[in-house]
């Protein structure tokens, strides 16, 4: 029975080009954007879509085939289940750089603004777990249940 379930999975092979504002890897397959949770820029992953729209899909990483050198072991034991800290697997300084790129791209693409000067990003300690206690609730279609966690 378990083998039947695995054989019915439609896995996509995706090369992650960038990171989006939600911390998901971005790939393009057949002209469609694929947003992959748990994937980092430069990685080659097998992923499974759980949201399918005409112009994009949202997927989760099933297996990392070629790992980024920026991937680190998440410090929270609940990282893979909670959903509250979407970038813990991403090296801290690379996170800052990715967030800066997202910010600049958003200003340019949506705001039609080009910054004359870009200041060095502000960053605190590299590990500020529970610095701000926030409750996050996420419905996971694949599991057909809600996940609740603090970050």
Language-model-derived ranges and their functions:
Residues 1-151:
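Non-catalytic accessory regions of SAM-dependent methyltransferases
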């Amino acid at each position: 029975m378990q083998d039947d379930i695995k054989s019915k999975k439609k896995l996509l092979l995706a090369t992650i080009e960038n990171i989006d504002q939600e911390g998901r890897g971005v790939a393009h397959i057949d002209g469609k954007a694929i947003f992959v949770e748990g994937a980092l820029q430069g990685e080659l992953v097998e992923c499974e879509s759980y949201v399918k729209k005409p112009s994009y899909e949202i997927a989760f990483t099933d297996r990392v085939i070629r790992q980024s050198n920026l991937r680190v072991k998440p410090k929270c034991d609940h990282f893979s289940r909670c959903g509250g800290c979407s970038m813990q697997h991403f090296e801290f300084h690379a996170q800052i750089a990715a967030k800066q790129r997202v910010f600049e791209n958003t200003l340019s693409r949506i705001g039609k603004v080009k910054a004359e000067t870009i200041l060095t990003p502000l960053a605190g300690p590299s590990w500020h777990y529970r610095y701000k206690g926030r409750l996050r609730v996420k419905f996971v279609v694949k599991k057909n249940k809600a996940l609740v966690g603090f970050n």
